[in-house]
A protein has these predicted regions:
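Bergerat-fold ATP-binding/catalytic subdomain of histidine kinases
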Residues: 76-91
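Charged regulatory segments coupled to nucleotide-binding catalytic modules in large multidomain enzymes
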Residues: 1, 190, 194, 226-228, ...
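Short beta-strand element(s) in the Bergerat
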Residues: 56-60, 162
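A short glycine-centered beta->alpha linker in the GHKL/HATPase_c
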Residues: 68-70
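Bergerat-fold GHKL ATPase/HATPase_c domain
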Residues: 1-48, 52-55, 72-75, 426-429, ...
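GHKL-type ATPase core
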Residues: 87-208, 213-219
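Short hinge/gating elements
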Residues: 13-24, 150, 165-187, 276-278, ...
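Acidic ATP/Mg2+-coordinating residue in the GHKL
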Residues: 64
Length: 458
């Protein structure tokens, strides 16, 4: 019997589709987290994230000590929509994360892997957007072992594992002004945000709460400490009885576990520092609500999923909601694992389950909270190792610089805040959202033409 089809295969244009897939909504922190997911699936127990600032030659590297991949496995992993079977504990879903997350931040993605410490064989390939633009082919480039360079070769000298290297960081630093203090401070700020994000998203792995998956993550050599959104080490924490809800969706049956917590108010925390630490990256009001976990990995931090609105009087209420990847379709998980919807057929049960925690949180706040007092200085949560500042290095090795003991913002004002019109326009374009850029481009073009050759500064 012939397997021939009368259909017409229409292969998408690589350069058009790959450009579009760069805009799925990843920021730097979420993109790094997606690569960490892959490392966890590969059985890694240690993951090192290194960031080097060196202008156009800046790079970001994620290295793990997992089992590594043979050349054929690596080529398949580099494929958009990689074919593989996922089990109930896998963090992956679509076979897109490695590529879409990485190329949302850079123009050149290189991946190298080693499976046997006793053999020198290293498989390495790269996606290069410049090459795709020229050839318009779905074509990865093989990287010869002799030309890998120290950023890729050094971590795999004596161990199994995988190295993911981002170069040509156009979405991180921008093309026009990738040098100088402004670019360095921007990367420093991103490192701080990534540290907070990873400490929160993977806190169950970092604390050893996920069976057989105890994890250590280093950011520029500094160990990331887990941030527990429920302050379970505080003696005055109130942990309500967990609720398990059975869910059936399109023939798939699973369980959704709900664990409600009421955090202590300010005066009942063990210390002022512990209270500030518990406020979270988004601070108290925005951190109330659901913390949704998929296979132990957090995919939502705070918010009530349209069951109720956030309220100052309920800011002490936090609820862990956990499910396995078998229920992904029911929760409508997106590619970037940054959006989730509560299934309509159990929304009423979830609302009933959280009603007690909301009432107790309101009573705790109304009865015991002191009058609000001004906070002396901002504190970023979660606390961890010293801020891993990226710095320029002629030796092409990551350099770690620690801040002073007292907190200071990741980005400090320069002594002269003036900049050229070109620099000003470039900065505006860098922070604009994709749908804003066409309008901003027209405005900045008109601004430059009006300033003309006067070389104005702003």
């Amino acid at each position: 019997m012939s397997n021939q089809s009368n259909g017409h295969e229409l292969i998408p244009s690589p350069k058009r589709l790959m450009k579009s897939l760069r805009d799925l909504g990843y920021d730097f922190s979420a993109a790094v987290a997606d690569i960490v997911d892959n490392s966890i699936e590969a059985g890694a127990t240690s993951i090192a994230i290194d960031v080097e600032f060196d202008g156009d030659d800046s790079w970001v590297r994620i290295t793990d000590n997992g089992k590594g991949m043979e050349p054929a496995q690596l080529r398949e992993a580099m494929r958009y929509g990689a074919e593989r079977d996922y089990d109930d504990e896998d963090l992956g879903r679509f076979g897109l994360g490695l590529k879409t997350a990485s190329l949302s931040q850079c123009q050149r993605l290189s991946v190298a892997s080693r499976t046997n410490p006793d053999r020198a064989n290293i498989a390495a390939y790269c996606w290069d957007m410049e090459h795709i633009e020229k050839t318009n082919k779905w074509e990865i480039l093989p990287l010869e072992r002799t030309g890998l360079g120290p950023a890729i070769h050094n971590p795999l000298k004596e161990a199994t594992g995988t190295v993911v290297l981002w170069q040509k960081l156009d979405r991180i630093l921008g093309f026009k002004h990738p040098y100088g203090e402004f670019a360095r401070k921007k990367l420093t700020s991103m490192c701080r945000e990534a540290e907070e994000h990873l400490a929160m998203v993977f806190h169950r792995f970092l604390a050893g709460e996920v069976p057989r998956r105890k994890l250590k993550i280093l950011l520029n050599g500094n160990s990331i400490k887990p941030w527990d959104p429920f302050s379970r080490d505080e003696p005055k924490i109130k942990e309500l009885t967990p609720v398990v809800i059975k869910l059936e969706h399109e023939g798939v049956t699973g369980s959704v576990k709900i664990e409600p917590f009421v955090l202590p108010n300010q005066k009942n925390y063990s210390s002022a520092e512990a209270f500030k630490r518990a406020s979270g990256p988004a601070k108290w009001n925005r951190q109330q609500g659901f913390y949704i976990y998929r296979a132990g990995r957090m995919i939502q931090s705070g918010g009530w999923c349209r069951l109720r609105t956030s309220d100052e009087h309920t800011k002490l209420a936090r609820v862990a909601l956990s499910f396995l990847p078998a229920l992904d379709e029911a929760f409508k998980i997106n590619v970037a694992k940054m959006q989730v919807q509560l299934p309509a057929n159990i929304r009423d049960q979830i609302e009933k389950a959280i009603d007690p925690v909301v009432k107790i949180a309101r009573k705790t706040y109304d009865k015991e909270s002191p009058a609000p007092a001004p906070v002396a200085s901002p504190v970023t949560s979660p606390p961890s190792a010293p801020v891993p500042y990226p710095k320029a290095s002629n030796a092409r090795q990551p350099v770690v610089s620690s801040p002073p003991a007292s907190y200071r913002p990741a980005v400090e004002p320069a002594s002269d805040n003036r900049c050229t019109i070109d620099e000003f326009c470039s900065r505006i374009e860098e922070i604009a959202k994709p749908d804003e850029r066409p309008v901003i481009a027209r405005v900045t073009k008109r601004l430059k033409s009006q300033v003309g050759s006067r070389g104005g500064r702003t």
